[in-house]
Amino acid sequence: MKILLTSDLHRDAGKLLWLQEEAPEHDALLVAGDLLNIYSNTGLIDQKSGILCWRDTVLKSGKSFAWCSGNHDFFNGDHTPMADASPLWMREHPSTETCVTDGESRLLETPEGGLAVTTLPWPVHGGDLVVDGYRTSYLDFVKKLLKAGRKIKDEEGVPWIVLNHEPPGGTPLSATYFAPEADFTRRIINAAEPDFSLHGHIHQAPTSPGGFWIFQLGPTVCLNAGQSQPGEPPHHILLEWRGPREWTAIWRGAGRTLRAECNGSLRV
């Protein structure tokens, strides 16, 4: 199973086109948040319409897709305090067996087999949410999603990946950046122990001093491709899954290519 991983696209037309053209060469495309750009001169409503069309084009190529929300993906008029957990625009089209949207745990079917995917929404509220009409806390919602992801992994015998925009704090994936959300990410990944977790948010992590694109946190392999400057091809990771504890990950960005392999143990 070949999975293309990235994040922080910020409605960069060049990056979107590159991924659209590359997606058919892979079994699935996963994006860990920040599809929109709140600093762009293009209105956010127009941005989200373009992103949804782009996603549909990827799906029409016959490949699978999943995304989670990032801090750029919420805006007034689409989301209000104490409302749904995820940006409404990201859920305008229902999920299917080949598409997992924000705030879900589902079995994602690909041409080469299944993949358990959990997509954690950005904690825009930092407190209570309304999920399916019921008030709950963000922590309880996340625990519910992770429990469901673990169940899919165990029952289906498939690898499990968690998408969460914020990288785990105190790891090279966040470089020197630290926020309370980063500590929260580290704690939930430590507790859930998925096979992989995909993050973003810190664009420069793979190329800055003390930063890197891959880190093992307990049994979980955490990934952050980082992101390039506007107009450049996107930083990305190609994950080729061959079986439990047998996979290859290749990071490409900033004119460099780095490789990590697991044949029982991780080698970078």
Question: Can you name each region flagged by the protein language model?
Answer:
Residues 2-10, 113-126, 161-165, 220-227, ...:
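Active-site-proximal beta-strand elements of phosphoester/diester hydrolases
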Residues 3, 27-28, 97, 159-161, ...:
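Short, Asp-centered acidic motifs that coordinate Mg2+ and/or phosphate
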Residues 6, 11-110:
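Core catalytic region of metal-dependent phosphoesterases/phosphodiesterases
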Residues 10-17, 36-40, 67-81, 105-107, ...:
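Active-site environment of divalent metal-dependent phosphoester hydrolases
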Residues 28, 185, 189-199:
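Proline-aspartate-enriched helix->loop->beta-strand connector
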Residues 37, 73-184:
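Conserved catalytic scaffold of divalent metal-dependent phosphoesterases
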Residues 60-65, 193-195, 217-220:
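A short helix->loop->beta-strand "cap" motif at the edges of active sites that frequently abuts
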Residues 105-113, 188-191, 205-268:
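Binuclear metal-dependent phosphoesterase catalytic core
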